[in-house]
């Protein structure tokens, strides 16, 4: 039952995170211009990098909550410690050279590492169906890419809020 709950939670979180991540990444330029001014256009790339990390943040929340609920708090805390050290090192190396893009990249690297390290310990508690997880990633990922391409295409011809509405319908 715990396995089923974990896999279903993964599915629902992935279904929510992918369209948001792809939609914002595709429309980042228009979103920044709508909310701010052209002065903030350099924030588009960092936004796109950070929003890519949203999917990993969603999944790391699931993995972390799962480990904590299964009495693996020490493991989860250790994972956070390792990721914190990696994040600091990435910022030390990337921030001076790449500025805010480097900081966003460090955050993305940390999000990915948090998922990978947490996922490493999940099989110690349950037997994960990797076939199921990969199936979800491929199906939802493909749908998200199709949505992103259509939103990007439509956004060239209509106001971006209309493109968002279209993306929601897809």
Mark where each language-model region is.
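Membrane-embedded alpha-helical segments of multi-pass transporters/permeases
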Residues: 21-26, 34, 49, 88, ...
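Alpha-helical transmembrane segments
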Residues: 63-71, 119-134
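Transmembrane alpha-helical segments of multi-pass transport proteins
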Residues: 83-86, 134-170
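Specific pore-lining/lateral-gate transmembrane helices of multi-pass inner-membrane transport
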Residues: 1-81
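Helix-coil boundary and interhelical linker segments in multi-pass alpha-helical membrane proteins
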Residues: 30, 93, 97-102
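A helix-boundary/kink motif common to multi-pass secondary transporters
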Residues: 72, 98-99, 103, 159
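Short alpha-helical transmembrane segments in multi-pass integral membrane proteins
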Residues: 5, 12-25, 80-81, 101-123, ...
């Amino acid at each position: 039952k715990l396995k089923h709950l974990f896999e279903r939670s993964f599915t629902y979180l992935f279904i929510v995170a992918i369209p948001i991540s792809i939609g914002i990444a595709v429309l980042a330029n228009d979103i920044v211009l709508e909310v701010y001014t052209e002065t903030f256009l350099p924030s588009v790339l960092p936004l796109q990098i950070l929003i890519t990390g949203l999917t990993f943040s969603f999944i790391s929340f699931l993995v972390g909550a799962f480990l904590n609920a299964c009495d693996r708090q020490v493991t989860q805390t250790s994972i956070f410690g390792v990721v914190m050290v990696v994040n600091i090192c990435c910022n030390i190396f990337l921030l001076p050279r790449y500025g805010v893009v480097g900081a966003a990249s460090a955050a993305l690297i940390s999000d990915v590492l948090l998922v990978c390290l947490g996922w490493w310990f999940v099989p110690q508690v349950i037997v994960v169906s990797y076939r199921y997880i990969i199936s979800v990633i491929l199906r939802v990922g493909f749908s998200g890419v199709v949505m992103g391409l259509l939103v990007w295409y439509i956004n060239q011809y209509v106001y971006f809020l209309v493109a968002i509405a279209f993306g929601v319908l897809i």
